[in-house]
From Swiss-Prot:
Function as written in the Swiss-Prot or TrEMBL entry: Decarboxylase; part of the gene cluster that mediates the biosynthesis of macrophorins, isoprenoid epoxycyclohexenones containing cyclized drimane moieties. The first step of the pathway is the synthesis of 6-methylsalicylic acid (6-MSA) by the polyketide synthase macA. 6-MSA is then converted to m-cresol by the decarboxylase macB. The cytochrome P450 monooxygenase macC then catalyzes the oxidation of m-cresol to toluquinol.
UniProt-annotated binding residues for Zn(2+): 7, 9, 159, 283
Organism annotation: Penicillium terrestre
Keyword field: Decarboxylase, Lyase, Metal-binding, Zinc
Protein name: Decarboxylase macB
One GO CC term, this protein: cytosol
GO MF entries: carboxy-lyase activity; hydrolase activity; metal ion binding
Pathway(s) of this molecule: Secondary metabolite biosynthesis; terpenoid biosynthesis
C-alpha cells in the first residue's frame, strides 16, 4: 500500500537533552524512547513508505523562558530532520520546528521558517494550538507569520498542546490519571481552528494548507453548532455557510482517530471532510504500538465496506507532498525493508 504517515513524531537527541533539563511536558505525558530504527520498524509493520516527521508539543516551547535557547533548539531539531531525510530520502520527510512564538519572537520565527523551507527543504512547518503569553493561532501577533506562510503556499501541521494554565501556572487536569492528551487535546485543536476562522486568519491566508491533528479533534462535531450560534447571536458577520466552508478547508489526519464511527463522520455519506482532505497518521511513538495497530485494523474494517482507501493511505498526502509521489521516485520500497 505504501502509506504516507503525516502524523509521526521524532525525538532528536537535542530535544531529549532540553526536555530533561526542565520539569517536563506540562500536559502530563511522558517522553517515550525513540530511534530512527523504531520508526522504520513501525512503518514496515503497516506498509508505510514515508513518514513526515514532526516534533510534538511542547516542542521548542519547553524553553519558552529563553528565546535564544528556544531558537537554538529549533535549529538543531531542523538540522536533525534534514539529516534523516538525506539519509533516507524516500522514507523520511519532516515538518520544521519554530522557536516559541511570542510577539517579540515572530521575526526570528520567520527567519527560521525561511531557512527550513529554502535551505533544508522541509515539507512544512509545525505549529502548536496555542502559545503561553500570546494565545491561540488566530491572535493578531501571529499575522506576519501567517502572511509569510500564505505567500509561500506552505503546509502547516497543527498539533495540540497543553491547555491554558491556572493562576499558579500549573496545567489543569481532570484527575492525575487523565493527562491532557487523552481527552483535552482534541478540543484544543477545535479551539484553535475556530479561532483561525473567527479571527479572519483563514480568509486572509487562503493559500496555506493546514493539517489538523487527530481528525480535526472536536471540530467536525462542533462546526455546525459554532457556525450557526455565532452568526445568529450576532457575534460574527461570518455566515454559517462561509464558516463551514472554511472549517472544511482544513486537512485532517487520522492519528488516533481512524475508528469506524469517526471515519463515517469524516468520509462517509455526507461526511464533513472535503474529498482529498483526510490523511493517514499513526502518532508514533507517543501512541503505543498496540493502540496504533488497533486503529489501522479499524481503518481496514471501514474501507473493506467501500471508500477510497488508497486516497486516505497515500494519495491525498502525495498531492500535498509531491516529492513523495511514487511515480516521481520510481522505486517501490519493499514492505518488509528497514
Amino acid at each position: 500500500m505504501n502509506r504516507i504517515d503525516v502524523h509521526h513524531h521524532f525525538i532528536p537527541p537535542a530535544y531529549v537533552k532540553a526536555f530533561n533539563s526542565t520539569p517536563g511536558d506540562p500536559s502530563g505525558w511522558h517522553l517515550p524512547k525513540w530511534t530512527p530504527e523504531s520508526t522504520l520498524s513501525l512503518m514496515a509493520s503497516h506498509s508505510t513508505r514515508t513518514a513526515i516527521l514532526s516534533l510534538t508539543a511542547p516542542g521548542t516551547s519547553i524553553m519558552s523562558n529563553s528565546p535564544v535557547e528556544s531558537a537554538n533548539l529549533a535549529r538543531q531539531i531542523n538540522l536533525y530532520g534534514f539529516q534523516l531525510h538525506q539519509e533516507n530520502p524516500t522514507r523520511f520527510g519532516f515538518f520544521a520546528s519554530l522557536p516559541h512564538l511570542t510577539p517579540e519572537t515572530i521575526p526570528s520565527a520567520v527567519e527560521e521558517l525561511a531557512y527550513a523551507l529554502d535551505t533544508l527543504q522541509a515539507d512544512g512547518i509545525t505549529l502548536y494550538t496555542r502559545y503561553s503569553g500570546t494565545g491561540y493561532l488566530g491572535h493578531a501577533a501571529f499575522a506576519p507569520l501567517w502572511e509569510e506562510l500564505n505567500r509561500r503556499k506552505a503546509v502547516v501541521f497543527i498539533h495540540p498542546t497543553n491547555t491554558a494554565s491556572d493562576a499558579q501556572n500549573k496545567p489543569e487536569m481532570v484527575n492525575p490519571k487523565l493527562p491532557q492528551p487523552i481527552i483535552d487535546y482534541p478540543h484544543e485543536t477545535c479551539r484553535t481552528a475556530v479561532d483561525l476562522i473567527t479571527s479572519g486568519t483563514i480568509s486572509k491566508n487562503p493559500d496555506v494548507k493546514i493539517i489538523l491533528s487527530h481528525g480535526g479533534g472536536t471540530l467536525p462535531i462542533l462546526a455546525t453548532r459554532a457556525a450557526n450560534l455565532l452568526y445568529d447571536a450576532g457575534l460574527t458577520e461570518i455566515t454559517p455557510e462561509t464558516f463551514l466552508e472554511q472549517a472544511r478547508s482544513f486537512y485532517l489526519d487520522l492519528a488516533l482517530s481512524g475508528n469506524v464511527g469517526n471515519l463515517e463522520l469524516l468520509v462517509g455519506k455526507n461526511g464533513f471532510a472535503k474529498p482529498g482532505h483526510v490523511l493517514y497518521g499513526s502518532d508514533f511513538p507517543y501512541a503505543p504500538v498496540e493502540t496504533i495497530n488497533k486503529y489501522v485494523g479499524m481503518m481496514e474494517e471501514f474501507f473493506a465496506q467501500g471508500g477510497d482507501k488508497e486516497e486516505v493511505a497515500r494519495g491525498a498526502a502525495a498531492e500535498l507532498f509531491p516529492r513523495f509521489r511514487i511515480e516521481d521516485n520510481k522505486e517501490m520500497i519493499p514492505q518488509n525493508r528497514l
